[in-house]
């Protein structure tokens, strides 16, 4: 039977069809918009991530960009350089070396913007920093009659490796230089550099006070002190500031890489850096990292605790530096201030560290460019304020220091009391436990004088960088300690420990007296370094069966050797004297 549609039925069917069609179209449109919206969201998110990365890269940018590297240029990438010079040029070079103790003739021909190869550890290079949260810094560079090219290379090195967002300023402090080029010429040059300020002292202040003058003008959160002949490597600044940002009581040093004074080769330490120590003359020394410090650190890029610092290059929170009492302004010129500050940091609740990811090259001159006549005065101040009863070991090895007028130290002692600083005994046991503490028993330390050749004393003078590379000899007694200071220990060792812990030995089948490294505390004493200092004044060596004897060479020069013992031979009689 056929179905007949009424008008009303047809209308309902059409309405239903349109409704379904509308819903279908809406679903399509919604799906399209959702898909397009997600695409736009992904695009926007990607753009924001890209912007964030771009912003991070922007924040790491230095104030100035180095010119492109020229691999053919002298000294580029830190390579050694040597010039082929005629007679006149060679004479000029030697004159400049004599004046500056650095090969300035070569330095003047090396780019002020040279590139240094970045050999830092992978973990250092891959570190990420939140630049917006890092403290800012003022870099303080004090100088006196510094050569033009080494000073400017230092300045450009800072400007070209320090993120602009972190570098508040470079403050140059001219400590009354008298070189013409450091007057108007320098002012004109730095007037074209952003964030570089020049301050001149009106009298010779010395390194300590010159740096303090710079610190008073600093506006950064952190004070970063550099010497005036340095080159900063890539990424040198961020690790220092990040560490201080996490712990304001940390005083942090970069790894100090060596720049050869003659060839300007940049020797970058790629292994574990050395840490600072001292000998009992209060002279700074480098030491390897002890096992307990290696065990304490979790990562090889963690900061390394150091008993002392070299002093030329370090960063410290400005607030904390002021809290600690800044530098001891009673110290003159330079020398000893680094140990004084090191003791103070540790004994007064701070910590001193070397950051393995921060590298700064330093030109170590052929010799000190100018004298430090106040070294004993400065070290005596440090000993009197911070070393308690242990200062006697310093004075025993530096007899002239007992007569030094080290000035008024009452304020420094009040500072120690106010900060509730710990004892030097605590420092030795907790910070530098590997340092051997001398016995210095009464009557058994000092110069050992020959009774047979009474003007002569035992003397040990080793070559540089080879402590055991010489033999015991005789030299005119001078009463200055140093090379003529020895200690006879309860272990029957004859120790030479003004510089490093060396023990007198007689090599097998030999008649001379050499030196070897002493055994560490608690370890057995080898037979060939045991001596008997007898009541009659003879010094007997049981292992060889011989006695120490003074004698004169055929040329008449006094010397010492091992000989058959003879109680009647005055040349075998010795005595300790201060």
Curated annotation (Swiss-Prot):
Site (Interaction with glycopeptide substrate): residue numbering on this chain: 459, 478, 483
Region (Catalytic subdomain A): 134-243
GO BP annotation list: O-glycan processing; protein O-linked glycosylation; protein O-linked glycosylation via serine; protein O-linked glycosylation via threonine
Compartment(s): Golgi apparatus membrane
InterPro entries: GalNAc-T, Glyco_trans_2-like, Nucleotide-diphossugar_trans, Ricin_B-like_lectins, Ricin_B_lectin
Pfam family, one: Ricin_B_lectin
Enzyme type, top EC level: transferase
Gene Ontology molecular function, alphabetical: carbohydrate binding; manganese ion binding; polypeptide N-acetylgalactosaminyltransferase activity
Bilayer topology annotation: Single-pass type II membrane protein
Binding-site residues for Mn(2+), renumbered to this chain: 227, 229, 362
Transmembrane stretches, start-end: 13-35
Cofactor: Mn(2+)
Its biological purpose: Catalyzes the initial reaction in O-linked oligosaccharide biosynthesis, the transfer of an N-acetyl-D-galactosamine residue to a serine or threonine residue on the protein receptor. Has a highest activity toward Muc7, EA2 and Muc2, with a lowest activity than GALNT2. Glycosylates 'Thr-57' of SELPLG.
Record note on domains: There are two conserved domains in the glycosyltransferase region: the N-terminal domain (domain A, also called GT1 motif), which is probably involved in manganese coordination and substrate binding and the C-terminal domain (domain B, also called Gal/GalNAc-T motif), which is probably involved in catalytic reaction and UDP-Gal binding.
Record's protein name: Polypeptide N-acetylgalactosaminyltransferase 4
Gene that this sequence comes from: GALNT4
């Amino acid at each position: 039977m056929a179905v007949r549609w009424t008008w009303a039925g047809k209308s309902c069917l059409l309405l239903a069809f349109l409704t379904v069609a509308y819903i279908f179209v809406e679903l399509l449109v919604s799906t399209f918009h959702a898909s397009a919206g997600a695409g736009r969201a992904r695009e926007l998110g990607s753009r924001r991530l890209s912007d964030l990365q771009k912003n991070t890269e922007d924040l790491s940018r230095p104030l100035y960009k180095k010119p492109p590297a020229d691999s053919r240029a002298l000294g580029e990438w830190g390579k050694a350089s040597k010039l082929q010079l005629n007679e006149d040029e060679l004479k000029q070079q030697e004159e400049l070396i004599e004046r500056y103790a650095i090969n300035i003739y070569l330095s003047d021909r090396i780019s002020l913007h040279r590139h240094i190869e970045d050999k830092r550890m992978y973990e250092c290079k891959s570190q990420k920093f939140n630049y917006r949260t890092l403290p800012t810094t003022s870099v303080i560079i004090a100088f006196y009659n510094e050569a033009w090219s080494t000073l400017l290379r230092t300045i450009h090195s800072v400007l070209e490796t320090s993120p602009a967002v972190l570098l508040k300023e470079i403050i140059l402090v001219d400590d009354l230089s008298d070189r013409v080029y450091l007057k108007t010429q320098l002012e004109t040059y730095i007037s074209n550099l952003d964030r570089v300020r020049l301050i001149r002292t009106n009298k010779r202040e010395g390194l300590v006070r010159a740096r303090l003058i710079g610190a008073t003008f600093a506006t950064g959160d952190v004070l970063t002190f550099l010497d005036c002949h340095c080159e900063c490597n890539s990424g040198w600044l961020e690790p220092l500031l990040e560490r201080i940002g996490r712990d304001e009581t940390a005083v942090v040093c970069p790894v100090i890489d060596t720049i050869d004074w003659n060839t300007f080769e940049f020797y970058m330490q790629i292994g574990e850096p050395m840490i600072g120590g001292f000998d009992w003359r209060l002279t700074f020394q480098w030491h390897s990292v002890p096992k307990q410090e290696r065990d304490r650190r979790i990562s090889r890029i963690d900061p390394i605790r150091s008993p002392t610092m070299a002093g030329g290059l370090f960063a410290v929170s400005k607030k904390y530096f002021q809290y600690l009492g800044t530098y001891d302004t009673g110290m003159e010129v330079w020398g000893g201030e680094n140990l004084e500050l090191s003791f103070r940091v540790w004994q007064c609740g701070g910590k001193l560290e070397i950051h393995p990811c921060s590298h700064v090259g330093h030109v170590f001159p052929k010799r000190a460019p100018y004298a430090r006549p106040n070294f004993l005065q400065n070290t005596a101040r440090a000993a009197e304020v911070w070393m308690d009863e242990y200062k006697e070991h310093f004075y025993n090895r530096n007899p002239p220091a007992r007569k030094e007028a080290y000035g008024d130290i009452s304020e420094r002692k009040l500072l120690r009391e106010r900060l509730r600083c710990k004892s030097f005994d605590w420092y030795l046991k907790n910070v530098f436990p590997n340092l051997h503490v001398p016995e210095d028993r009464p009557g058994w330390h000092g110069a050992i004088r020959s009774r047979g050749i009474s003007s002569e004393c035992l003397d040990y003078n080793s070559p540089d960088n080879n402590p055991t590379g010489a033999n015991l000899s005789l030299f005119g007694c001078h009463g200055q300690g140093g090379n003529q200071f020895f200690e006879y220990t309860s272990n029957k060792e004859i120790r030479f420990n003004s510089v490093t812990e060396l023990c007198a030995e007689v090599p097998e089948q030999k008649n001379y007296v050499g030196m070897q490294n002493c055994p560490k505390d608690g370890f057995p004493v080898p037979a060939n370094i045991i001596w008997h200092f007898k009541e009659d004044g003879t010094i007997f060596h049981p292992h060889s069966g011989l006695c120490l004897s003074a004698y004169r060479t055929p040329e008449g020069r006094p010397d010492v050797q091992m000989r058959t013992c003879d109680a009647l031979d005055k040349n075998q009689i010795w005595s300790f004297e201060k």
